[in-house]
Every structure is written in C-alpha cells, then in structure tokens.
A protein has these predicted regions:
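Extended, amphipathic alpha-helical scaffolds
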Residues: 275-311
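Generic N-terminal leader segments that precede the first folded domain
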Residues: 1-2
Length: 311
C-alpha cells in the first residue's frame, strides 16, 4: 500500500477497495458530475470520498465514451444489488462487435443513449451470476426488459405460444431469445421439453416433421436413433420417402417450403406422424434433450407458418 493509500485509508477513513469508492473515483476520472439521488445513502459517503481522492491526486481526466459510461453505470447500479462487476470497456467493445450492430433477439439496429427500446443494454446471460466477461450479452432494452428474470423454460413457453397480447416480443423473437440463451447457458438439469411441447402439439408436429424433411442432419439422426426402438424402422423410412417424393413431384401448397403442408395433404404421412408423436410422448424422458436441440434448429419462420387445408 502506498503512503497516499495508507493516509486516505487509515487517517481519512476511505475504503479504497470499496466499490462505492471506486465509482466515485471513476466519476472524477471520466469528468462526470456526482448526483446524490443516484446512490443509496449508505454508499454516498464512500462515493464522495472516492471522488475527492481522485481530485486530491489530480488524476488525469479522460473523455468518457459510451463503453466507459456503460461500465460505470452498471457498477453504480450494483452498489445496491451487490452483484459482482468484473467487466471493462474492452469487454463491451468486443461484445458489441459480435452483434454487427443488430440486436440478436429483435433483429433491429441498436441505438445509443436515445432513451428508446432499441437502445443497447448489457444483460447477464445467467441471472444468478454477476457482470463478468463470460456472462454478458448485448441486447436491446426491449429484449432485456422482456427477458427480465425469465429462465430458459419460460422463454421456450413464450416461443411456442401462438399469440400473447401481453408480450412486447413476437413469437419469432421469443424463439430467437430462447435459442440465443440456450447456446450460452450451462444447463444443470433437463428442460422438460416434451412436457412443454405436449401443450403445443402444433409445434411438436413441426419439430418432428422437420426431422423427416431434413433427415441427414446430425440432430435428425440422433432423433431417429432414439425413436427406432419404439417404432418400426420401415415406418420412418417410408414416411421420409413419401414426404420427399411429394416435394419433388410438386404436390405442395403455395409458399410451403418446409414440408409441413406436404404432410397435411397426405393422409398416409399424417397418420405416420401421429404415430411418431405418440411414441415420443410415451417415452418423453428419453426425448427431452434431443427435442430441445431439434426445436432450436428449426428455421425461425417455421413457427409462423399457417397450415393449408388438405387438398
């Protein structure tokens, strides 16, 4: 500890390792005014001490950019919550670059400091952890507010709902949110995906059909291998051939390019898919993990596809 630090710590009563002290110090360093109403009364004294310490040291002032400002804003908010803050402006710069300027949830361009729902914001991927480099993502204010304290099952439940009048996000945006966090979260337990899809049979239908429509993907192979002991292999193979044959012969409803209406317009294929759905539901525990993978591999637009009436 330097003589300066010893003086301010032991004589003046400053706690230089205190986050409130650091926040005050950085306010001076970044040439920002202190506003008492932004801090809790219990932190205000240490914030002022930090500001005065920087002033006494005649710390060189820096021009505050949006990254420095955002980090300081987060650190200030975390004085009350007690969350860990270990991110830097460089971490935010790297995360923003990954987005290419678009919110990965709403797919809308970011705005900055405009007090809009499209403004950029920093979200904690895992709500139980703090602001550390491997636990942050840049999303819009709109997406961040919609997520709130939601866990992954809640996001999926929103994604499979056809219409939620109380939601600020579309069904597709909920799907993109679920996929975004699914790829970043470390799951410690199953999501009970089969149970979620049981209450949305239309989505379960789409998930299963897509495995037959694109049978050569890795996840489709896994799905078929789990299904095989409970369903005649010949039934699976014939259903795949039937779907592909109808596609090649042009027996498909206009604008239906995902195989869904191909099945609806074929009584044989429809009966086969119904059998497969029943087998999945009967052995739900074995399908939970692969159904989650298959669900998030769906093209987002598939969720919005309306079925055509059989011809």
């Amino acid at each position: 500890m330097t003589g300066f630090e010893t003086f301010f710590t032991t004589v003046m009563g400053f706690d230089m390792n205190n986050l409130a002290f650091e926040v005050g110090f950085d306010h001076y360093r970044l040439d920002l005014h202190l506003e008492a109403d932004r801090f809790e009364e219990a932190d205000w004294e240490q914030v002022q001490f930090g500001f005065q310490a920087a002033k006494q040291q005649d710390v060189s002032k820096l021009r505050c950019n949006k990254f420095e400002s955002k980090v300081l804003s987060i650190r200030s908010r975390c004085l009350k919550s007690g969350l860990e803050v270990a991110i830097t402006a460089k971490d935010l710069m790297a995360e923003l670059e990954i987005t290419n300027g678009l919110c990965p949830i709403t797919e809308e361009p970011f705005t900055f400091a405009q007090q809009n729902l499209t403004d950029w914001s920093i979200d904690r991927v895992d709500n139980t952890r703090g602001y550390v480099p491997d636990n942050i993502a840049i999303v819009s204010v709109k997406a961040n507010k919609a997520k709130g304290d939601s866990d992954l099952p809640h996001m999926i439940e929103q994604a499979v709902r056809k219409h939620n009048p109380n939601s600020t996000l579309t069904q597709k945006q909920w799907f993109l949110m679920g996929r975004f966090y699914y790829e970043r979260l470390t799951l410690t337990e199953t999501l009970n995906m089969t149970a979620i899809l049981y209450h949305s049979p239309e989505i379960l239908f789409k998930v299963i059909v897509m495995q037959l429509y694109y049978p050569n993907t890795k996840h489709s192979h896994v799905f078929s291998s789990i299904l095989a002991p409970y369903c005649p292999k010949l039934l699976i193979e014939r259903t795949i051939k039937l779907i592909l044959k109808r596609y090649k012969t042009g027996k498909v409803a206009p604008r239906s390019n995902h195989g869904l209406n191909l099945v609806l317009n074929s009584p044989k294929a429809l009966d086969a898919i119904f059998i497969l759905m029943m087998r999945v539901l009967e052995h739900y525990a074995e399908f939970d993990e692969i159904l989650t993978v298959c669900f998030f591999k769906l093209p987002p637009d598939v969720l919005d596809i309306e079925y055509s009436k059989p011809v």
